[in-house]
Structure formats: structure tokens, C-alpha cells
């Protein structure tokens, strides 16, 4: 702020030393330095406030410019897309209003009617599937009534197969028993063999 060189400071120091003397010169220097610091602080505050005001003014101008912009300043493609979206939305609203006016109902009532129609359609589909299943079951029972001999033959064949399986199981079990008895006779302990002649002699 104060563009003072070394020579100017030296000149001021000599003048102060001559005028004030060596005793009051240090006090005067401290007082002057305090004033200089205060003045510099005030100047810095003023500069900061001015800078903030300028920034605020620039920001306000930018906001005003942004508010002044409209769809005409946009690109033609974007403006066309926005117009098409608006037109389609208005058309859908007009169709709903027209349908509601023809049936003397509101939009919510129209939605409720559509939901009821969907529920009715689903119930009809369920009833149709039940009818088809019932008709298939009836047809199968009719076929069984018309050809009972075929059904009885199938049942008899199943019974014969089961009986054949049981006979095979019995034969296999008997064969296992015979083999087991043969092995027991073959590997009988010698004591039993020795006792058998003695018993025969006693009997004779």
C-alpha cells in the first residue's frame, strides 16, 4: 500500500530521531506501526467487500439471463421433441375425457371398469379350463364303461404277474435253504461224526 523504499525509511528515522529524541522514538515507532496495521486491515476489508459485491452482481446477472431464456432459444430438435410430448399428452387426456363423457363416468370409474372386465375375463378362463377337465374325465369313464372286458383283462394280467413274482421268490428262498443245509452238513464238527458210530453200536 505504501510504496516506501529503504532510503525513505532511513530518512524518516533520522528526522524522528532528531525531532523526538532517542527516548520517545521507539514509542512513536510502535504507535505508527499500529496505525499502519489498522489502515492495512481496513483496506483489506474494503477490497474483500468490493470483490464480494462484484461476484454477487455477476451472479445476479447470470440468473437474470437464465430466466430470460425460453424454449425458442433451444435447439430446433429439442424444441420439436418437447412439442410432440405435449401434443401426445394432451391427446391422451382428450381421449380419456371423451370416453368419460360418452359413458357419463370419470377417469377413476373408467379404470375401475377396466379392472372389473379383466377380472371377469380371468374367471371365464378358469371356468373354461374346469369344463375341459370335466369333459376329459367323463370321456375316460365312458370308455371304461363301454369296454369293461379290456379293463378286467388288464387287472387279471397284473394279478398274474404279481403271483408269478411271488412264486419265483418262494423258489429262490427254497433253493437258498437247500444250499445252506448242504453247507451245514459238509462242515459239521468231527465230534458229532465220532458220536454217531458209538450210538449206532449201542443200538445194535
UniProtKB/Swiss-Prot annotation:
Q: What is its main location?
A: membrane
Keyword Membrane on entry: yes
Molecular-function GO terms, alphabetical: protein transmembrane transporter activity
Q: Please give the InterPro entries that the UniProt record associates with this protein.
A: TatB
Q: Per its UniProt entry, which superkingdom is the organism in?
A: Bacteria
Q: Where in the cell is it found?
A: Cell inner membrane
**GO cellular component labels:** TAT protein transport complex
Where is the segment annotated Disordered?
154-204
Which keywords does this Swiss-Prot/TrEMBL entry list? Answer: Cell inner membrane, Cell membrane, Membrane, Protein transport, Translocation, Transmembrane, Transmembrane helix, Transport
Name a biological process GO annotation.
Answer: protein transport by the Tat complex
Any transmembrane segments, and where? 1-21
Its topology with respect to the membrane? Single-pass membrane protein
Q: Does the keyword 4Fe-4S apply?
A: no
Record-linked Gene3D superfamilies: 1.20.5.3310
Q: What segments bear the compositional bias annotation Polar residues?
A: 154-166
How does the record describe its quaternary structure? Answer: The Tat system comprises two distinct complexes: a TatABC complex, containing multiple copies of TatA, TatB and TatC subunits, and a separate TatA complex, containing only TatA subunits. Substrates initially bind to the TatABC complex, which probably triggers association of the separate TatA complex to form the active translocon.
By sequence similarity, the record places it as follows: Belongs to the TatB family.
Say what the protein does.
Part of the twin-arginine translocation (Tat) system that transports large folded proteins containing a characteristic twin-arginine motif in their signal peptide across membranes. Together with TatC, TatB is part of a receptor directly interacting with Tat signal peptides. TatB may form an oligomeric binding site that transiently accommodates folded Tat precursor proteins before their translocation.
Record's protein name: Sec-independent protein translocase protein TatB
This protein's species is Mannheimia succiniciproducens (strain KCTC 0769BP / MBEL55E)
Amino acid at each position: 500500500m505504501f510504496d516506501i523504499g529503504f532510503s525513505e525509511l532511513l530518512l524518516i528515522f533520522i528526522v524522528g530521531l532528531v525531532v523526538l529524541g532517542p527516548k520517545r522514538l521507539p514509542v512513536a515507532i510502535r504507535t505508527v506501526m499500529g496505525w499502519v496495521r489498522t489502515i492495512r486491515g481496513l483496506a483489506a476489508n474494503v477490497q474483500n467487500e468490493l470483490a464480494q459485491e462484484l461476484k454477487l452482481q455477476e451472479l445476479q446477472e447470470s440468473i437474470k439471463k437464465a430466466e430470460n431464456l425460453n424454449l425458442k432459444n433451444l435447439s430446433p430438435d429439442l424444441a420439436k421433441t418437447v412439442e410432440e410430448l405435449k401434443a401426445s399428452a394432451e391427446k391422451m387426456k382428450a381421449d380419456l375425457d371423451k370416453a368419460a363423457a360418452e359413458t357419463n363416468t370419470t377417469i377413476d370409474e373408467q379404470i375401475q371398469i377396466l379392472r372389473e372386465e379383466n377380472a371377469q375375463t380371468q374367471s371365464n378362463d378358469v371356468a373354461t379350463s374346469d369344463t375341459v377337465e370335466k369333459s376329459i374325465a367323463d370321456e375316460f369313464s365312458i370308455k371304461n364303461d363301454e369296454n369293461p372286458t379290456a379293463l378286467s383283462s388288464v387287472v387279471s394280467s397284473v394279478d398274474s404277474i404279481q403271483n408269478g413274482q411271488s412264486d419265483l421268490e418262494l423258489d429262490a428262498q427254497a433253493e437258498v435253504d437247500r444250499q445252506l443245509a448242504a453247507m451245514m452238513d459238509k462242515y459239521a464238527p468231527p465230534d458229532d461224526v465220532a458220536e454217531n458210530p458209538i450210538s449206532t453200536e449201542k443200538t445194535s
